[in-house]
From Swiss-Prot:
Protein name stated in the entry: Probable tRNA pseudouridine synthase D
Active site: residue positions: D93 (nucleophile)
Family: Belongs to the pseudouridine synthase TruD family.
Assigned EC number: 5.4.99.27
A family per Pfam: TruD
Catalytic activity: uridine(13) in tRNA = pseudouridine(13) in tRNA
PANTHER family linked to this entry: PSEUDOURIDYLATE SYNTHASE PUS7L, TRNA PSEUDOURIDINE SYNTHASE D
GO biological process: tRNA pseudouridine synthesis
Chain's role: Could be responsible for synthesis of pseudouridine from uracil-13 in transfer RNAs.
Enzyme class: isomerase
Annotated gene: truD
Family matches, as PROSITE patterns: TRUD
TRUD domain mapped to chain residues: 166-353
UniProtKB keywords: Isomerase, tRNA processing
Length: 390
């Protein structure tokens, strides 16, 4: 299955280049709902809520070369508490330097202040009476270095004066997996209740792997789970959990209960994203000005993020959505998946604004800075210039 990321806004040549040569080349700073930017390397003196009922503590997590889930697991171990005691507004990239607000309950400030983990900083600790929930942010500010630009483009003076005010609102490759873009395929199998195929796709099916990992995935495909378990490394924790859980229950669906609930949800979310990206491609041919029958958000046409309670558009957009719906043989009721969650469905803008976009070309490095609303992908912005997905 492709990722359905096909079209561009800009009618220009793409100049290639390398993203994320170093973690510092990709800085992501969360923007809180009130517009406060959680800046890398700086602290904010948040006022404690008074009176405080003792429920929640919020803090800023600054991390380098950690994904959000692994960083959180490390903090859980360091504080000797449980994963369910923590929440966050949104996940962040791994090979990057990022900030994000997190919340917890059942901990003392002193426990957080004592955490010492390489490449992780806990700061801006605040007592709060409010639970931090997924989506409790405006968006993110990005500062991105693009290196190794094709030589013929380095001489163009306009690299320091690039313009972009909106992009196609694709879900980026991160939603599908940078190293192994198969998350949406696993999600489709889960939606279809084909848990055996989901298991083999996630644990087997080598793509670009080499060495022990490639051999381990080949062993999974051949049914030699014990052999695969011996070869998978620490970096394949979730594959190992799935196999061990399968040994325990001899049931492919039960195997997935070994994974964090958020990860199981992400599989189905990725399938929804795959379908949405196809809607962007189909709508591209008609333009993104509002048309009769469109469902608008901020005067921008939206597409269906298909779930069990999807509201379809009318007119041309409605026809696009129903065509994809029928092509995929969708049954909305099947988005209620026992042990995985109820995937409600919503609407999402087909294009999205890019705020405060700036470019600077210096010493053979192009630096782009901009802000995006939550749920939007910086690599879709950089792709407009480089032609690369990530």
């Amino acid at each position: 299955m492709p990722l359905n990321i096909e079209k561009y806004i800009l009618k220009t040549n793409r100049f290639g280049g390398t993203l994320k040569k170093y973690p510092e080349d990709f800085i992501v700073e969360e923007i809180m709902p009130d517009g406060t930017v959680l800046e890398v390397g700086k602290e904010i003196d948040f006022l404690d809520e008074t009176p405080w009922n003792g429920s929640f503590i919020h803090f800023t997590l600054e991390k380098r070369n950690w994904n959000t889930m692994d960083a959180l697991s490390a903090i859980v171990r360091a504080t000797k508490t449980k994963r369910k005691n923590f929440g966050f507004a949104g996940t962040k990239d791994k090979f990057a330097v990022t900030t994000q607000r997190m919340g917890c309950f059942g901990l003392k400030k002193e426990q957080l202040e004592s955490v010492k983990i390489p490449e992780i900083i806990i700061k801006d600790i605040q007592k709060s009476n409010k639970k931090l929930r997924m989506g409790d942010l405006f968006g993110n500010r990005f500062t991105i270095n693009i290196r190794d630009i094709e030589k013929k483009y380095m001489e163009l003076e306009n690299l320091s004066d690039l313009k972009l005010d909106h992009v196609l609102n694709y879900f980026g490759i991160q939603r599908f997996g940078l190293k192994r873009p198969i998350t949406h395929i696993v999600g489709k199998f889960i939606y279809e209740r084909d848990f055996e195929s989901a298991f083999y796709t996630y644990c087997g099916t080598p793509i670009s792997e080499t060495g022990d990992e490639k051999e381990a995935r080949e062993l999974v495909d051949s049914g030699n789970f014990k052999g695969a378990l011996k070869l998978f490394s620490k970096g394949n924790e979730y594959e190992k959990r799935l196999i061990q859980q399968y040994f325990k229950y001899k049931d492919f669906k039960m195997a997935f209960t070994a994974l964090p609930p958020q990860l199981n949800s992400m599989f189905v979310n990725a399938y929804q994203a795959y379908l949405f990206n196809e809607m962007v491609n189909e709508r591209y041919n008609f333009g993104f000005e509002p048309l009769t029958g469109d469902i608008l958000e901020d005067n921008i046409p939206t597409g269906a993020l298909i779930g069990y309670n999807t509201e379809f558009g009318k007119g041309i957009q409605g026809e696009i959505e129903k065509e994809i719906f029928n092509r995929e043989n969708i049954d909305l009721k099947k988005f209620k998946i026992e042990d995985f969650g109820n995937f409600y469905g919503t609407r999402r803008k087909l294009i999205t604004p890019v705020y405060d976009f700036k470019s600077e070309f210096k010493e053979k490095v192009l630096t782009l800075s901009f802000k995006l609303e939550r749920g939007n992908y910086a690599t879709i912005v950089t792709r407009e210039f480089t032609g690369n997905l990530g």
